[in-house]
Amino acid sequence: MKTVILLTFLWGLSCALPVARYQNTESESSEERTGNLAQSPPPPMANSDHTDSSESGEELGSDRSQYRPAGGLSKSAGMDADKEEDEDDSGDDTFGDEDNGPGPEERQWGGPSRLDSDEDSADTTQSSEDSTSQENSAQDTPSDSKDHHSDEADSRPEAGDSTQDSESEEYRVGGGSEGESSHGDGSEFDDEGMQSDDPGSTRSDRGHTRMSSAGIRSEESKGDHEPTSTQDSDDSQDVEFSSRKSFRRSRVSEEDDRGELADSNSRETQSVSTEDFRSKEESRSETQEDTAETQSQEDSPEGQDPSSESSEEAGEPSQESSSESQEGVASESRGDNPDNTSQTGDQRDSESSEEDRLNTFSSSESQSTEEQGDSESNESLSLSEESQESAQDEDSSSQEGLQSQSASRESRSQESQSEQDSRSEENRDSDSQDSSRSKEESNSTGSTSSSEEDNHPKNIEADNRKLIVDAYHNKPIGDQDDNDCQDGY
């Protein structure tokens, strides 16, 4: 029953009694946060953990202050050394009077509840020590604001869970829940902090701290958006730069294509020019060959004369040798033995005779060449005369042909005229015959018409009679026989 009463009393305290010391700790934490904002936004995780631990501490402090009697003895005098050490470690100089000893009611009720409360207080002291160590590390490293901001959302529900666990453990404990608190870990409170009982002020301070944390978050989110926007702008610039590069490459490729087309066109023009030059050279070589052929043809009759002259010159020494042999034979046949003088004279005579012969031979050669030229000229003249004669013959033949054609035309015209005359005579005869025939026909037609007129009434009467007979004998109209049978059957 006592444990149930204690639990209900603790529940009423946690719902109704405010903690004045919580305001002081929140104001100090807000001052530290503003100081850290000057350099960089501090991690809110450490602050949230610290505030949660302070909430658990103030609940314990309120319980202790509630159950502390007027004449109770506090054991804070013996723990001053521990308090000073904790001040140096945590950096907080806000500590309350510690009551590590049990109250008078705990002494009356006994020790089992005291042991349970000691275990719960040990758990809370460990959580508060962790929070103070995180706060110190956050103060030493203020530059890691973004990482702590990402950890803040994770740490807050954990901190809330730790406070709820500590409260549930306090509710479960049967014996005195005031327990021995931790030794100077920043969660104890002074007796002066319990004097203010205004819950509105604590709530306003909590709302202020939440607004400040929201402002810090907005600033951090702005800081996060700024680099993302700069990254987006950098990405857009990279895309524009890459598009410009691709456009430049396309332009370069187009220029290369144009250059290749120009090169191909220049090559084609060069090939055409070289072909034209070659054709011109070939035409020139052909003209040169034609001129050389014409010159060789012109030089061929002239070249025959020196060849004939060389053959004649080669024949001269043979003639000289033959003449000398003849003279020697003549001298031997005479049997003369002339002297040297006669021999020399004979030699001179023979030389002179040879010269005369050479002269005569050369003259004969010149005459032969002249005769050849005359013969060639005569031949050309004869050819020209023959051509003239052939032309005259052609003219005469053409004239004869024209004469024969004219004679044939005249004969044809005469024949056509005679034929026309005969035809005209025949036509006249036929006309006379036609006229006689027409007269005869007219006469015959007149006689026939008169005879037909005479025979016409007779035929009508006969027809009428036949019709009457036919009707009497029941004969058809087309039946002209005397038989009873119809024609065609």
From Swiss-Prot:
Glycan-bearing residues: N340, N378, N443
Regions of compositional bias (Polar residues) in chain numbering: 263-274
Q: Subcellular localization, per the record?
A: Nucleus; Cytoplasm; Secreted, Extracellular space, Extracellular matrix
Residue span of region Disordered: 22-489
Task performed by this protein: May have a dual function during osteoblast differentiation. In the nucleus of undifferentiated osteoblasts, unphosphorylated form acts as a transcriptional component for activation of osteoblast-specific genes like osteocalcin. During the osteoblast to osteocyte transition phase it is phosphorylated and exported into the extracellular matrix, where it regulates nucleation of hydroxyapatite.
Query: How is the quaternary structure described?
Result: Interacts with importin alpha.
- The entry's protein name is Dentin matrix acidic phosphoprotein 1
List the source organism: Rattus norvegicus
**What taxonomic ancestry is recorded?**
Eukaryota, Metazoa, Chordata, Craniata, Vertebrata
The gene coding this protein: Dmp1
